[in-house]
Swiss-Prot record:
It catalyses: [protein]-peptidylproline (omega=180) = [protein]-peptidylproline (omega=0). It comes from the Bacteria. This is Trigger factor. Pfam families: FKBP_C, Trigger_C, Trigger_N. Residues 161-246 form the PPIase FKBP-type domain. It is an enzyme of class 5 (isomerase). GO terms for cellular component: cytoplasm. Its EC number is 5.2.1.8. The gene is tig. Signal peptide: none annotated. SUPFAM superfamilies: FKBP-like, Triger factor/SurA peptide-binding domain-like, Trigger factor ribosome-binding domain. GO terms for molecular function: peptidyl-prolyl cis-trans isomerase activity; protein folding chaperone; ribosome binding.
Amino acid sequence: MQVTVETKEGLERVLTITVPAANIEDAVSAELRNIAKNRRFDGFRKGKVPMKMVAKMYGQAVRNDVMGEVMQRHFIEAIVKEKINPAGAPTFTPVEFAEGKDLVFSASFEVYPEVALQGLDKVVVEKPQVEVKDEDVAEMLETLRKQQSTWADADIAAEDGTRATINFVGSIDGEEFEGGKAENFPLEMGQGRMIPGFEDGIKGKKAGDELTIDVNFPEEYHAENLKGKAAQFAIKVVKVEARELPELNDEFVAKFGAEGGVEGLKAEVRKNMERELAQAVKNKIKEQAINGLVEQNNIDVPSALIDQEVQVLRQQAVQRFGGNADTAPELPRELFEEQAKRRVVVGLLLGEVIKSEELKADDEKVKALINEMASAYEDPTEVVAYYEGNEQMMNNMRNVALEEQAVEAILAKAQVSEKAFGFNELMNQQPA
């Protein structure tokens, strides 16, 4: 076998491989003999059919099959010999393939980039300094009360924090448009659900009031036919309701299954907030470390890996919305390409950190991660046992631990300082 390696643009490589004719003919002859021995032919006893007849009937098909198998096998031998690490499946192209002649074929593929980490000492990370304060707990309790609130008719004007039930009809240049009409539409004021200017027109109005407002649809509005258009809405206020909050008492506490009355609920809420805060701090530090790593290391990315990641993201998107990945229409690549490339880059760079630092998943860290995750469940012991009894889940947690260790290795060389945050300030920066 002869092999030549050609370096194309970027990460693309082309191997040209020559396989001696004798190898091909031996493989073709062996397969034809196998067919003659094991298949039945009309007019002949099994295994007694003339080889010329078998070759005439099956020769070309066998030769094509042999070519495919030979190209795959010799490609693998070639990349092992040349110490090449392909990043995806090759594209084979026969250059010369005729009976009695050497097989010459090319294999085009991409390789993984050679990553030489740099600039870790220029990565800037601000560690959040934050705690759960009494006022944060009080605000969370108020949120829980709002979640359990009811609405009651009131002789009041619509304002932020009230709920207005309205009928409306929208028109553009005097013509009603699709989706611009509703009856008994509940609108919680101050939530920003409607286009700019819509709620402003309703503020100060009471049940029975009728009005017409002029608004403009935003240029980025989701409906193409409405983007940037001026519209009029005829609105009738059916009713205005005030929010009624439940008392913070034992009856309210019972809805959440907390023990120890109001103080017990406060303690449980604080505990949950502190757990979420610890994760948010970890996420914020990790985000900065990885962003810095990516900014300091510009690498080529194999398109084959991006393609694979796009497909993963597509499937996740379909599943997230309750669809079937096999039957759902294929979502546009553009929706996922940027995120897919980012994930591939991060994976390659973190992989190089792990390799260069010779990191192995720390068993104690794996155990701590499982315990931390399990603490959010009603029976943590049961969750821990489930993980420890499932090798796939354990491997997932080992990968998480290894990634955290890689981030710690980056932080050890980075410029790390501290920055004060409020609870809500930090939590609002977390991805949805």
